[in-house]
Amino acid sequence: MAKLRIAFSGIGAVGGYYGGMVAARYQGTIKADIFFIARGENLKAIREKGLQMQLGIRTIHTAPALATDNPAEIGPVDYLFCCTKSYDLEENIQQLKPVIGPETVIIPLLNGLDIEERIHNILPGQEVWKGCVYIGSRLTEPGVVEKFSLKERIFFGNKDANKDKQTELLKLLMYARLNAFNPADIDLHIWKKFFMISTAATATSFFNQPIDEVLAQ
Protein backbone atom coordinates (compact mmCIF):
# COMPACT_ATOMS: atom_id res chain seq x y z
CA MET A 1 0.00 0.00 0.00
CA ALA A 2 1.40 3.38 -1.03
CA LYS A 3 2.07 6.02 1.58
CA LEU A 4 -0.59 8.67 1.95
CA ARG A 5 0.58 12.19 1.15
CA ILE A 6 -0.99 14.88 3.30
CA ALA A 7 -0.30 18.61 3.08
CA PHE A 8 -1.23 21.43 5.44
CA SER A 9 -1.28 24.95 4.02
CA GLY A 10 -1.01 27.72 6.60
CA ILE A 11 0.97 26.60 9.64
CA GLY A 12 -0.52 29.02 12.15
CA ALA A 13 -2.83 28.52 15.10
CA VAL A 14 -5.04 25.94 13.35
CA GLY A 15 -2.77 24.43 10.72
CA GLY A 16 0.15 24.37 13.12
CA TYR A 17 -1.77 22.37 15.71
CA TYR A 18 -3.49 19.89 13.41
CA GLY A 19 -0.56 19.57 11.04
CA GLY A 20 1.80 19.21 13.96
CA MET A 21 -0.24 16.49 15.63
CA VAL A 22 -0.52 14.50 12.40
CA ALA A 23 3.18 14.93 11.65
CA ALA A 24 4.13 13.90 15.18
CA ARG A 25 2.18 10.66 14.82
CA TYR A 26 3.02 9.68 11.24
CA GLN A 27 6.28 11.25 10.16
CA GLY A 28 8.92 8.59 9.67
CA THR A 29 6.34 5.80 9.41
CA ILE A 30 5.25 3.75 6.43
CA LYS A 31 1.69 5.13 6.68
CA ALA A 32 2.00 8.76 5.54
CA ASP A 33 4.26 11.64 4.56
CA ILE A 34 3.26 15.03 5.93
CA PHE A 35 4.07 18.33 4.22
CA PHE A 36 3.85 21.90 5.54
CA ILE A 37 3.30 24.89 3.26
CA ALA A 38 4.31 28.03 5.14
CA ARG A 39 6.18 31.26 4.55
CA GLY A 40 8.41 33.92 6.06
CA GLU A 41 9.91 33.64 9.52
CA ASN A 42 7.56 30.81 10.44
CA LEU A 43 8.86 28.68 7.59
CA LYS A 44 12.45 29.56 8.47
CA ALA A 45 11.95 28.47 12.09
CA ILE A 46 10.27 25.19 11.11
CA ARG A 47 13.07 24.37 8.69
CA GLU A 48 15.74 25.11 11.29
CA LYS A 49 14.18 23.68 14.46
CA GLY A 50 11.01 21.85 13.48
CA LEU A 51 7.59 22.72 14.88
CA GLN A 52 7.09 23.03 18.64
CA MET A 53 3.64 22.54 20.14
CA GLN A 54 2.94 23.61 23.71
CA LEU A 55 0.02 21.59 25.06
CA GLY A 56 -0.38 22.68 28.66
CA ILE A 57 2.48 21.13 30.63
CA ARG A 58 3.47 18.96 27.67
CA THR A 59 5.64 20.03 24.74
CA ILE A 60 5.83 18.14 21.45
CA HIS A 61 8.52 18.67 18.84
CA THR A 62 7.95 17.43 15.32
CA ALA A 63 8.98 18.03 11.73
CA PRO A 64 7.31 17.33 8.38
CA ALA A 65 8.81 15.44 5.47
CA LEU A 66 9.20 18.86 3.88
CA ALA A 67 8.39 22.44 4.84
CA THR A 68 8.30 24.82 1.89
CA ASP A 69 6.75 27.94 0.41
CA ASN A 70 6.85 26.34 -3.05
CA PRO A 71 4.06 23.76 -3.52
CA ALA A 72 5.74 22.51 -6.71
CA GLU A 73 8.44 20.95 -4.51
CA ILE A 74 5.76 18.67 -3.02
CA GLY A 75 3.66 17.59 -5.99
CA PRO A 76 0.13 16.14 -5.86
CA VAL A 77 -1.13 14.91 -2.49
CA ASP A 78 -4.01 12.72 -1.33
CA TYR A 79 -5.38 15.17 1.22
CA LEU A 80 -4.88 18.93 1.37
CA PHE A 81 -5.90 20.83 4.50
CA CYS A 82 -6.34 24.56 3.84
CA CYS A 83 -5.83 26.46 7.09
CA THR A 84 -5.33 30.04 5.91
CA LYS A 85 -7.70 32.93 6.56
CA SER A 86 -10.92 33.12 4.56
CA TYR A 87 -9.91 36.35 2.84
CA ASP A 88 -6.77 34.63 1.47
CA LEU A 89 -8.62 31.59 0.12
CA GLU A 90 -8.67 32.37 -3.61
CA GLU A 91 -5.02 33.42 -3.73
CA ASN A 92 -4.04 30.41 -1.64
CA ILE A 93 -5.87 27.92 -3.87
CA GLN A 94 -4.20 29.36 -6.96
CA GLN A 95 -0.79 28.96 -5.33
CA LEU A 96 -1.61 25.40 -4.24
CA LYS A 97 -2.43 24.06 -7.71
CA PRO A 98 0.86 22.09 -7.95
CA VAL A 99 -0.20 19.89 -5.00
CA ILE A 100 -3.75 19.40 -6.30
CA GLY A 101 -4.14 16.41 -8.58
CA PRO A 102 -7.27 14.69 -9.96
CA GLU A 103 -7.55 12.49 -6.84
CA THR A 104 -6.70 15.17 -4.27
CA VAL A 105 -9.32 15.85 -1.61
CA ILE A 106 -9.33 19.43 -0.32
CA ILE A 107 -10.47 19.95 3.28
CA PRO A 108 -10.74 23.66 4.15
CA LEU A 109 -10.71 24.46 7.88
CA LEU A 110 -11.95 28.01 7.40
CA ASN A 111 -14.90 29.85 8.88
CA GLY A 112 -17.72 30.60 6.45
CA LEU A 113 -20.66 29.09 4.61
CA ASP A 114 -19.41 29.53 1.05
CA ILE A 115 -15.92 28.05 1.25
CA GLU A 116 -16.68 24.97 -0.88
CA GLU A 117 -18.36 27.11 -3.54
CA ARG A 118 -15.41 29.51 -3.68
CA ILE A 119 -12.98 26.65 -4.18
CA HIS A 120 -15.15 25.14 -6.93
CA ASN A 121 -15.22 28.53 -8.68
CA ILE A 122 -11.47 28.07 -9.18
CA LEU A 123 -11.35 24.27 -9.44
CA PRO A 124 -14.62 23.01 -10.94
CA GLY A 125 -15.14 19.32 -10.29
CA GLN A 126 -12.45 19.04 -7.62
CA GLU A 127 -13.41 16.93 -4.61
CA VAL A 128 -13.89 19.22 -1.60
CA TRP A 129 -14.99 18.12 1.85
CA LYS A 130 -16.37 20.69 4.23
CA GLY A 131 -14.63 21.17 7.55
CA CYS A 132 -14.61 23.19 10.75
CA VAL A 133 -12.74 23.16 14.03
CA TYR A 134 -13.27 24.23 17.61
CA ILE A 135 -9.96 25.06 19.23
CA GLY A 136 -8.22 27.70 21.30
CA SER A 137 -4.69 28.03 19.93
CA ARG A 138 -2.22 30.62 18.74
CA LEU A 139 1.15 31.00 17.08
CA THR A 140 3.20 32.49 19.91
CA GLU A 141 6.35 32.92 17.84
CA PRO A 142 7.69 31.54 14.57
CA GLY A 143 7.66 27.76 14.75
CA VAL A 144 5.82 27.60 18.09
CA VAL A 145 2.10 26.83 18.50
CA GLU A 146 0.30 26.92 21.85
CA LYS A 147 -3.03 25.17 22.43
CA PHE A 148 -4.75 26.69 25.45
CA SER A 149 -8.21 25.16 25.16
CA LEU A 150 -8.85 22.03 27.21
CA LYS A 151 -10.43 20.26 24.27
CA GLU A 152 -10.42 20.59 20.51
CA ARG A 153 -12.70 19.13 17.86
CA ILE A 154 -12.45 18.78 14.10
CA PHE A 155 -15.44 17.99 11.89
CA PHE A 156 -15.21 17.14 8.20
CA GLY A 157 -17.19 15.40 5.51
CA ASN A 158 -19.18 15.41 2.30
CA LYS A 159 -22.44 13.51 2.04
CA ASP A 160 -21.80 12.78 -1.64
CA ALA A 161 -18.20 11.60 -1.26
CA ASN A 162 -16.85 8.07 -0.92
CA LYS A 163 -17.58 6.91 2.63
CA ASP A 164 -14.63 4.52 2.78
CA LYS A 165 -12.26 7.36 1.96
CA GLN A 166 -13.81 9.55 4.65
CA THR A 167 -13.47 6.71 7.15
CA GLU A 168 -9.82 6.34 6.16
CA LEU A 169 -9.13 9.96 7.03
CA LEU A 170 -11.18 9.77 10.22
CA LYS A 171 -9.13 6.82 11.48
CA LEU A 172 -5.91 8.59 10.53
CA LEU A 173 -6.84 11.70 12.51
CA MET A 174 -8.07 9.74 15.50
CA TYR A 175 -4.84 7.74 15.57
CA ALA A 176 -3.03 11.08 15.76
CA ARG A 177 -4.90 11.63 19.05
CA LEU A 178 -7.28 14.20 17.59
CA ASN A 179 -10.97 14.51 18.48
CA ALA A 180 -12.12 13.96 14.91
CA PHE A 181 -15.69 13.49 13.68
CA ASN A 182 -17.16 12.59 10.29
CA PRO A 183 -20.87 13.38 10.82
CA ALA A 184 -23.64 12.37 8.46
CA ASP A 185 -24.74 16.02 8.23
CA ILE A 186 -21.62 18.18 8.03
CA ASP A 187 -23.70 21.21 7.00
CA LEU A 188 -25.33 21.24 10.44
CA HIS A 189 -21.93 21.63 12.08
CA ILE A 190 -20.81 24.30 9.60
CA TRP A 191 -23.94 26.32 10.44
CA LYS A 192 -23.46 25.83 14.19
CA LYS A 193 -19.92 27.16 13.92
CA PHE A 194 -21.10 30.06 11.78
CA PHE A 195 -23.74 31.06 14.34
CA MET A 196 -21.18 30.86 17.13
CA ILE A 197 -18.58 33.06 15.46
CA SER A 198 -21.24 35.49 14.18
CA THR A 199 -22.55 35.99 17.70
CA ALA A 200 -19.06 36.42 19.10
CA ALA A 201 -18.09 38.87 16.34
CA THR A 202 -21.21 40.96 16.95
CA ALA A 203 -20.54 41.13 20.68
CA THR A 204 -16.86 42.02 20.38
CA SER A 205 -17.62 44.68 17.76
CA PHE A 206 -20.41 46.22 19.83
CA PHE A 207 -18.32 46.42 23.01
CA ASN A 208 -15.03 46.97 21.17
CA GLN A 209 -13.40 44.42 23.45
CA PRO A 210 -11.92 40.92 23.04
CA ILE A 211 -14.25 38.03 23.75
CA ASP A 212 -12.73 37.15 27.15
CA GLU A 213 -13.44 40.67 28.45
CA VAL A 214 -16.97 40.60 27.02
CA LEU A 215 -17.66 37.31 28.78
CA ALA A 216 -16.21 38.63 32.03
CA GLN A 217 -18.89 41.32 32.07
Where are the regions a protein language model picked out?
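Residues at the C-termini of beta-strands that transition into short coil/loop
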Residues: 38, 57, 69-71, 110, ...
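Short, charged/polar "capping" segments at the starts of alpha-helices
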Residues: 42-45, 116-117, 164-165
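Glycine-rich beta-alpha junction loops
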Residues: 41, 111-113, 132-137, 160, ...
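Rossmann-like NAD(P)(H) cofactor-binding subdomain of soluble oxidoreductases
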Residues: 59-144
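Nucleotide donor/acceptor-binding cores
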Residues: 2-4, 78, 152
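NAD(P)+-binding Rossmann beta1-loop-alpha1 motif at the extreme N-terminus of oxidoreductases
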Residues: 1-56
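A structural signal for isolated positions on well-ordered beta-strands in alpha/beta enzyme cores
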Residues: 7, 33-35, 107, 129, ...
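Internal alpha-helical scaffold of NAD(P)-dependent oxidoreductase catalytic cores
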Residues: 98-99, 121-127, 142-217
